[in-house]
Amino acid sequence: MNLTNHFLVAMPGMKDPYFQNSVIYLCEHNDEGAMGLMINAPIDVTVGSMLKQVEVDSEQPKPNQASLDKPVLNGGPVAEDRGFILHKPKGSYQSSINMTDQISVTTSKDILMVLGTEDEPMHYLVALGYAGWEPGQLEIELTENSWLTVEADPKVIFNTPISDRWKVAVQMLGINAAQLSADAGHA
């Protein structure tokens, strides 16, 4: 089972309060473990203020103020000072991986130079930190009914309001979120 390019959707009974109601985009899942980014946990920092904090300033004018006003997301509890940009593929950056033809993840600072400019990706989100699992750990959590899984949809990442992403991800499974029980069992 490889869940790369899938969403992990926290079940209502999630034991870890850090991940309650979270939606995680899995960037990698293999025999060595898993790595993903929470896509619905905004922090009290905007993209523009983050760029000032990391002293990124390009010579290009920043005409897209709305882009700079977007919130930065809490990507997860590991390496919280490390930035990850999920974006529609556009441009060439030092450290980018095309997950699909509609989703790339970039970790290099060069993408930060274009945020807020006409050269920025059409859709993007910035996350600090990531969620990580040791080999077999995610599989155990799946058998404990901590997570639902569904193939990732770029529209949920880039076009769905942050506060609606959990509900929309649940609906992708054909489930009414209001009827999802915190009590899970096995048949």
UniProtKB/Swiss-Prot annotation:
Sorted alphabetically, the Gene Ontology cellular component annotations on this record are:
cytosol
Q: Which domain of life is it from?
A: Bacteria
Q: Name one Pfam family in it.
A: DUF179
HAMAP family under this entry? Answer: UPF0301 (MF_00758)
Family affiliation: Belongs to the UPF0301 (AlgH) family.
Its name, as the record gives it, is UPF0301 protein VS_2679
Taxonomic lineage from the root: Bacteria, Pseudomonadati, Pseudomonadota, Gammaproteobacteria, Vibrionales
